[in-house]
Curated annotation (Swiss-Prot):
GO terms for cellular component: cytoplasm; mitochondrial matrix. It is an enzyme of class 2 (transferase). Methylates MRF1 on 'Gln-270' using S-adenosyl L-methionine as methyl donor. GO terms for molecular function: protein-(glutamine-N5) methyltransferase activity; protein-glutamine N-methyltransferase activity. It comes from Schizosaccharomyces pombe (strain 972 / ATCC 24843). This is Probable MRF1 mitochondrial N(5)-glutamine methyltransferase mtq1. Substrate binds at N200, P201, P202, Y203. It catalyses: L-glutaminyl-[peptide chain release factor] + S-adenosyl-L-methionine = N(5)-methyl-L-glutaminyl-[peptide chain release factor] + S-adenosyl-L-homocysteine + H(+). It is found in: Mitochondrion. Keywords: Methyltransferase, Mitochondrion, S-adenosyl-L-methionine, Transferase.
Length: 309
């Protein structure tokens, strides 16, 4: 959408900083909203700075946005449910779609009556947004094992989860740097003692990355956290192999894994994941997000159901 020159002039006259924000948003009302967020959040980020110094940071932020630099990296945070997640370049920005399904799952887990801790595995934790929300909101005693291949992501996840623990009272967390596609023994060892697997893996194919993602995602967010081989399905195939092998190697009665939640990116992908787990041991259901797009596959053990789906 091309903004009429007279509208550009009106924006500039109202506030020169709105013009670079418009270049990022392509929407005058969104540009004004971002201006409000930037002013508010930077003032909170730098409470001791002078008015002149704050103004320089605000102008610099607007110039960065004109180059499609993500707002969350500028403001260094992103709301996620009732908590705030610190953000930095090199670590995937939490999405509202993830926030939605995590809230639903935690709400269902909170209905459980358990005395022994629930063991939760968060594979591909990234910023730690999923683990942080669980720590802050799950009232059932629990221990989380958070896994990622990226040192940078894990360092940020530790920071976010430490802050979340202050909100909650019954959770603990451990962190593991693991290449989940290749270190199968370490992953299977964690799976073997977990009741719940929560996973938002890389799931975008090379073709979809080039054709469907925003320029800000392509330019600035880590491809390591976004792209997957095999049409975007590499992680789902690998994890299903791990789980099936683990169940074959161990007596089912001694494997507590009862609930698996995978985020997915399309209906086609959801059907693939569902087909990997629709068997005698598991029941898989597809759920949509608030935009009515298929977003998660929720998989439960038929002989050991934790929650109803």
């Amino acid at each position: 959408m091309r903004l009429p020159r007279i509208t550009k002039f009106a924006l500039y006259r109202e506030n020169p900083c709105l013009l670079p924000l418009y270049h990022a948003t392509r929407d005058p009302s969104l540009a004004k909203r971002e201006w409000t967020w930037i002013c508010k959040e930077l003032k909170l980020l730098y409470p001791e700075i002078s008015k002149h110094g704050l103004r320089k940071k605000i102008v610099n932020a607007c110039q960065l946005r004109a180059r499609n630099y993500p707002l969350q990296y500028i403001l260094k945070s992103q709301p996620f449910g009732n908590i705030k997640i610190d953000c930095q370049q090199g670590v995937l920005i939490p999405r509202w779609e993830t926030e939605e399904w995590v809230e639903r799952v935690v709400d269902k887990l909170n209905r459980l009556e358990r005395l022994k801790p629930l063991k939760i595995l968060d594979l591909c934790t990234g910023s730690g947004c999923i683990s942080s929300f669980v720590l802050a909101n799950l009232r059932v005693p629990h221990t989380i094992e958070a896994v990622d291949v990226s040192k940078k992501a894990l360092k940020l996840a530790v920071k976010n989860c430490d802050r979340a623990i202050a909100h909650g009272t019954v959770g603990k967390i451990n962190f593991h740097q693991i290449d989940v596609l290749n270190e199968h023994e370490r992953v299977e060892s964690l799976l073997q003692t977990s009741h719940v697997l929560l996973c938002n893996p890389p799931y975008i194919s090379d073709d979809d990355f080039a054709a469907q993602t925003d320029i800000s995602v392509r330019k600035y967010e880590p491809k390591l956290a976004l792209l997957a081989k095999n049409g975007g399905n590499e992680f789902y195939y690998k994890f299903s192999q791990y789980i099936k092998r683990m169940l074959q190697r161990n007596a089912k009665d001694f494997v507590p894994l009862s609930l698996i939640v995978f985020e997915i990116g399309s209906t086609h992908q959801a059907k693939i994941v569902k087909s990997l787990f629709d068997d005698t041991n598991w029941q898989a259901n597809i759920e949509q997000d608030g935009a009515h797009q298929d977003r998660v596959v929720i998989i439960t053990r038929k002989d050991r159901r934790l929650i109803d789906i």
